[in-house]
From Swiss-Prot:
Biological source species: Homo sapiens (Human)
Protein name: HMG domain-containing protein 3
Keywords from the named record: DNA-binding, Nucleus
Record keyword Nucleus present: yes
Subcellular location: Nucleus
Main location: nucleus
Matches recorded under SUPFAM superfamilies: HMG-box
Residue numbers spanned by region Disordered: 363-391, 448-505, 562-588
GO terms, molecular function: DNA binding
DNA-binding region: 42-110
Comp. bias regions, Polar residues: 370-391, 562-572
Length: 1292
């Protein structure tokens, strides 16, 4: 096959192949897998999750060597849940193939192969990627210098990409896992020859190198025309290169590191000393070798658990057998150099590797991943640098971007060092200049690994126009997206740089780090014909200077440096880094656009940069990290985003209630702000704005935490005149008062970091006339709105800084916080919210001496009412704070209360009921979240229509979270108000059902004599002439009456049925249920069944009906609680007797929680016995078993009779029983929840205050496991073990 081939000779040494015309990528020697062939025993097929686990386990172990096995499992499990459908389908397909007994690697590779086999090849060739190079075409011209190319791969290295020769910029492999690609010999000869003659770029792409040793020895490779000789020389030593390999000039060596490390992009460039002015510009051969974590790991990786002797440990590096004594654990393994870490030993910083470019003075940058130092290379000192590398560099991975346009011979070479973190990298070529473009395609889904696209622009190619990322796209002329990619994507899933400004870290996410990815090679460049792109206004272009700026200073915050008197070096912008370049005109502009941390969750929390060591602020407070911002927050209510400047303050990204906005388009077009929004866009805007408000607005509940804000409000309300700068000629008068103009200080969207649009009148985001309402001000001001230009976000940004003392209600009303707190205090006293709002407005009018028209007053009332309930929903509040400090989450006695006059008017609300009977379970979290979202939406969009139709079956009761059961039910849809009182004894019927004498499912087969006998036992009258059907109907009517609750009272017309609630003996609310239909025993059963612990004694005036209803609704549960006693102290078939219940007495403090959570046994009484009793003294003649439910039968319950009598005249009961009627359903439910919380929390605060007053020095108030208040006494004397013991004593 020898033939002339432009004088270029390539000799490929193969393993087990004697022909020199084929290049394959076999894997390393390893044990072959056994599948269902030749009768061999097969391995147990693994699940998709297990395949993913094996792929990513080793990487996580190396990235986080200090984590225990359980934490690693949690992280991998979490990342599996976060995988997208496409990412998970890869492992599902592999699992399916493995289950079928096929080799998943070869099968998947065969499925993605696009090039058929060449005729004539032997079928015994390895099933892998190979390149056919005609040997006959390599024997011609050999007058040019040669390039030695050596690509060596470790035995332990995982699967890498194969080499595939592409013939045109557009013929990029479209699949990530191609197994077999070959090019015809004749076509390759013709096309490579054409490329060589035209001076184009020869590309060698990589998709997937199988795990075998690949060695190209003595391979001379030459690109270019024979009359333009030049030599390519650049030596790059990868991390983890031990020793100093002797490599001659003109060779390229890429030794592969250990498993799990990334491999840099290797660019082979020409030698400037051999080039001439006529040499074609920017000709090179690029070998993109993607990170090992990107390709599939070998299946030989096993999860092993090594057991060592007590007090000993082993090295975590696979294959290393080093053991150590735990007490003398070294920081790194002396055998393999693996970092072992320690409690107080930080990981050392990786050594720097320097790269010096042999030619070109254009902009050069290295993208440095997380936990890395910048990597540079010097051509003449590659051997020295290689020998200095240590094994600790296994943690460091670099990406080296080299751009080398031609220049004059002898010009001094320069190198630049740039640190770029969490950034999109965009290298933009200036018009008329020769260079390359590096484009970062933005990752559009939260949690997806960032991609860096390396490419060159070509105006002749279809994809020449490189669009800018969404963060920096100009609003006037958005660039079209390319039809085909023109760059090489280097995916870096497992690494990420620390943020420049010390921003907080997100939660770890692994996200399919081992999934194979595709590498896209750059298109050839045409000299002097670079494409031009306009720089967006959102971020300024970088100035090109000769000096390298200092990206990082020392480890102190800028505010700390300022206090210490040190100079502060501030970057030009939050997402900009200035990259210098030499004096040459042939330069490229580099722009770094910052990516929000939410977009790319990092692997780990630690970083290699020096930690911030800021000076202390006031105790319990923190300051914004932006040195130019003076915003101060309380630690308990620290916002995620600074409301003043928009800087990210959060440290933890785990947010369950809100989801990040997912962008479906890789490069979304910027919204045209001149066109009105469509219906779909308005819905997107609504959701985004609500998410923004919940994320940024977090109002403290305690007024003391806002003392400084109230002082500011008072100062601005006083409107003082201050004389300053008084001189002989001039007098300066300063007036402190409220501003007339309010807008959000943010310039970027606080959700997606896109630029914000600020428009004029009648635009999508223009200024609006707004009321300013304070205790002494009632005036109109201007509120400016800004809108996010990301079409997938469109969030409206208004003035929402509560620490200025104002709360924004839909840019229609700015009300001071002291007025909202005043309304709350009035509601706490039982005042109708609408009355309180009218009192506030009347007071303000009197103070300002302004008279409002009826229309203006009505508008202000509605705005202030909606704003108040949104203010309550945005207040940070823990509803467990209302749990009684004496009873805790498991009171021994609970008493039923009702509020029949606390109702909702039905004139503006229509309740609907499901057409078919479904589950009785209701979702408590969803119901209350819907109520909160509704009022917040009314504030964000005042023109939105409130809820007018309500599904009554989803109304959930309210419990403190720790007192709520696992399943919460509402069976009001099954309640029948038309059921008439039926004669007969329900108690007797329930007893017959429990004994099995009567079975309703067999009632049709009973004879008339048996039916008459059952009716007599139940006391149901019947006639001798009644038919069998009439007898059955009489029996079923009694059953339905008992199950329905017997006493379903119809509420007043056009009103709901009020609410019922249960309280502990200290009048703290334990649970509430809001009724649409009239109250019945069924509602009390729902309330009891939805509680975390069914109380041992439940006091209700309809005790018999509640007990019988519970027997029919939950027969198995009641059989455990009271057997056949039907909730009585003794059997209802026998005369009532006095029963002693010693478990109900006050017992000594105990925290015994040995019983399981869902056990029927009560955690305080330690018994399963429950009773339903009443406190009535008058016997009920219609209820023969009422005497068995009397509270007086138990002497231990005698004190509670006094408590019940005192509740009627108590203050909390008076507040709760105030008659009130609401027109707005959302406000009604939120009001009742707020009232339950405020009245209960006031009682608990008094309990805490009493205990604090009795505390001795050294004692603190705590809550125990059952959430009861107690006093913990901490012994200061050191015990023999050197530990402190806590002895708790209950305070009742």
């Amino acid at each position: 096959m020898d033939a002339s081939y432009d004088g270029t000779e390539v000799t490929v040494v193969m393993e087990e192949i004697e022909e020199a015309y084929c290049y394959t990528s076999p894997g390393p020697p390893k044990k072959k897998k056994k599948y269902k062939i030749h009768g061999e025993k097969t391995k147990k097929p693994r699940s998709a999750y297990l395949l993913y686990y094996y792929d990513i386990y080793l990487k996580v172990q190396q990235e986080l060597p200090h984590l225990p096995q359980s934490e690693i499992n949690k992280k991998i499990s979490e990342s599996w849940r976060l995988l997208s459908v496409a990412e998970r389908s890869y492992y599902l397909e592999k699992a399916k193939l493995e289950k079928e007994g096929l080799d998943p690697n070869s099968k998947l590779s065969a499925l993605t192969a696009v090039v058929p086999d060449i005729p004539g090849f032997r079928k015994i060739l390895p099933r892998s990627d190979y390149i056919i190079i005609p040997k006959s075409s390599l024997q011609e011209d050999r007058s040019c210098p040669q390039l030695e190319l050596c690509v060596a791969q470790n035995q332990m290295s995982p699967k890498g990409p194969p080499l595939v020769s592409n013939t045109a910029p557009e013929t990029v492999p479209s699949h990530a896992g191609m197994a077999e690609q070959c090019l015809a010999v004749e076509a390759l000869a013709e096309e490579v020859g054409a490329l060589t003659q035209s001076g184009a770029v020869q590309e060698i792409a990589t998709s997937e190198i199988l795990s075998q040793d690949v060695l190209l020895e003595d391979a001379s490779l030459e690109v270019g025309e024979s009359h333009q000789p030049y030599q390519t020389s650049l030596v790059i030593e990868e991390t983890l290169v031990n020793g100093s390999p002797d490599l001659p000039t003109g060779s390229l060596a890429v030794p592969h590191p250990q498993v799990g490390e990334s491999v840099s992009v290797v660019t082979v460039m020409r030698d400037s000393s051999e080039s001439s002015s006529s040499a074609p510009a920017t000709q090179f051969i690029m070998l993109p070798l993607p990170a090992y974590s990107v390709v599939e790991n070998p299946t030989s990786i096993k999860l092993t658990t090594t057991y060592t002797r007590r007090g000993h440990g082993t090295c975590t590096s696979p294959g290393c057998s080093f053991t150590y004594v735990t007490r003398h654990k070294p920081p790194k393994c002396p055998t393999c150099g693996n970092f072992l870490g320690g409690k107080w030993i930080p990981k050392e910083k990786p050594a720097k590797v320097k790269v010096e470019l042999a030619s070109g003075v254009s902009s050069k940058g290295s993208v440095v991943k997380r936990n890395q130092q910048p990597v540079t290379t010097e051509q003449n000192s590659s051997k020295e640098n290689a020998s200095k590398l240590t094994l600790e560099n296994s943690e460091a991975v670099s990406q080296l971007l080299n751009v080398a346009p031609p220049r004059e011979v002898g010009e001094e070479s320069e190198w630049e060092e740039v640190i770029i973190s969490d950034a999109h990298v965009l290298v933009k070529e200036a018009p008329g200049n020769c260079g390359t473009a590096v484009t970062k395609t933005p990752v559009v889904k939260s949690g997806v690994q960032p991609e860096v696209t390396l490419g060159t622009t070509d105006n002749d190619s279809p994809g020449a126009d490189v669009p800018t990322p969404s963060e920096g796209t100009s609003t006037s002329s958005p660039l079209p997206a390319p039809k085909k990619p023109t760059g090489a994507d280097l995916l870096t899933p497992g690494s990420r740089a620390p943020e420049l400004k010390g921003r907080a870290r997100g939660k770890p996410s692994l996200l399919a780090a081992a999934r194979p990815m595709r590498a896209i090679l750059p298109a050839p460049v045409n000299v002097g014909r670079g494409s031009s792109m306009g720089l967006p206004r959102a971020r300024q272009a970088f100035s090109l200077s000769d000096k390298t700026p200092s990206v990082r200073t020392c480890g102190l915050k800028p505010s700390t440096l300022k206090q210490l008197g040190q100079p502060i070096q501030q970057p030009s912008g939050p997402g900009e880094v200035k990259l210098p370049s030499g004096p040459s005109n042939r330069t490229s502009q580099v722009k770094v656009v910052e990516v929000k941390p939410d977009m790319f969750p990092p692997y780990k929390y630690s970083c290699t940069v020096t930690l911030d060591l800021g000076l202390a602020t006031s105790r319990g407070r923190g300051k914004c990290k932006n040195p130019s911002c003076s915003y101060v927050y309380t630690n308990r209510h620290k916002p995620r985003i600074c409301p003043s400047c928009g800087v990210n303050l959060a440290k933890d990204r785990t947010e369950k209630t809100t989801k990040a906005i997912e962008v479906s388009s890789p490069l979304p077009d910027v919204l045209n702000a001149t066109e009105p929004l469509s219906t779909a866009q308005r819905e997107i805007q609504r959701q985004s704005t609500l998410q923004l408000l919940r994320k940024v607005l977090q109002i403290p509940e305690n007024e003391s935490e806002l003392a400084e804000v109230f002082a500011l409000i008072h100062e601005l309300n006083s409107s003082r005149l201050i004389l300053s700068n008084v001189s002989e000629e001039t007098v300066t008068i300063e007036q402190t008062s409220w501003s007339n103009y309010y807008e959000s200080p943010s310039t970027q969207c606080l959700l997606c970091s896109s630029p914000l649009f600020k428009g004029g009148q009648n635009s999508l985001a223009g200024p609006q006339e707004c009321w300013l309402l304070t205790a002494s001000r009632l005036q109109t001001v201007t509120a400016q709105v800004k809108m996010c230009l990301n079409p997938h976000c469109l969030a409206l940004h208004s003035f929402i800084d509560i620490y200025t003392g104002l709360f924004n209600v839909g840019n229609k009303l700015l009300v001071s916080l002291d007025l909202l707190f005043a309304i709350r205090n009035q509601i706490k006293l039982g005042e109708d919210p609408r009355v309180s709002i009218n009192v506030v407005l009347k007071s303000v009018q009197e103070q300002t001496e302004k008279t409002l028209t009826s229309e203006e007053l009505s508008q202000l009332q509605e705005l202030l009412c909606n704003g108040y309930w949104a203010f309550e929903c945005l207040t940070v509040r823990d509803y467990n704070d209302m749990i009684c400090g004496i009873c805790g989450v498991a009171p021994k006695v609970e008493m039923a209360q009702r509020s029949e006059e606390n109702v909702l008017a039905l004139k503006s609300v229509e309740f609907t009921w499901p057409e078919f009977l479904g589950s009785n379970e209701v979702n408590v979290e969803d119901f209350w979240a819907t109520m909160e979202t509704e009022v917040i939406e009314q504030v964000a969009f005042p023109a939105s229509i409130p809820i007018t139709k309500f599904d009554a079956s989803v109304i959930a009761p309210f419990f403190p979270p720790l007192m709520r059961g696992a399943v919460v039910v509402n069976t009001e849809k099954d309640k029948n108000l038309d059921v008439q009182p039926v004669p007969g004894s329900g108690s007797a019927l329930v007893r017959l059902l429990q004994e099995g004498t009567c079975k309703l499912d067999e009632i049709g087969s009973y004879s008339e004599e048996k039916l008459q006998h059952l009716l007599r036992q139940c006391g149901i009258p019947f006639g001798a002439e009644d038919s069998k059907d009439q007898l059955c109907f009489s029996l079923l009517a009694l059953y339905e009456s008992v199950q329905n609750g017997a006493r379903a009272i119809r509420p007043p017309r056009h009103f709901t049925g009020g609410k019922i609630y249960k309280v502990c003996p200290h009048q703290v609310v334990c649970g509430s249920k809001y009724l649409v239909r009239g109250e019945s025993a069924r509602d009390h059963v729902d309330l009891l069944a939805s509680s975390r612990h069914w109380p041992p004694v439940y006091v209700v005036d309809m005790a018999t009906s509640v007990a019988l209803c519970a027997d029919l609704c939950y027969p198995e549960l009641t059989n455990q609680m009271w057997g056949r006693n039907q909730g009585c102290f003794s059997s209802p078939t026998e005369p009532p007797v006095s029963v002693s219940c010693p478990e109900l007495l006050d017992q000594h403090y105990t925290v015994d929680m040995t019983e399981t959570e869902h056990s029927i046994q009560h955690p305080v009484t330690k018994t399963a016995t429950r009773r339903i009793v009443h406190a009535g003294l008058q016997p009920n003649p219609g209820d023969p078993s009422a005497g068995h439910h009397s509270l007086a039968l138990c002497p231990e319950l005698a004190p509670y009779a006094t408590i019940l009598a005192s509740i009627v005249d108590s203050k909390p009961n008076g507040v709760r029983q105030r008659p009130i009627a609401f027109d707005n359903a959302t406000h009604y439910y939120l009001y009742n929840r707020l009232m339950d919380f405020l009245t209960s929390r006031e009682i608990v605060n008094r309990q805490i205050h009493d205990i604090v007053q009795s505390c001795q020095p050294g004692e603190v108030v705590i809550r125990d496991t059952l959430y009861r208040l107690g006093v913990a006494q901490i012994k200061t004397e050191t015990e023999e073990e050197g530990e402190e013991e806590e002895v708790a004593a209950v305070a009742e």
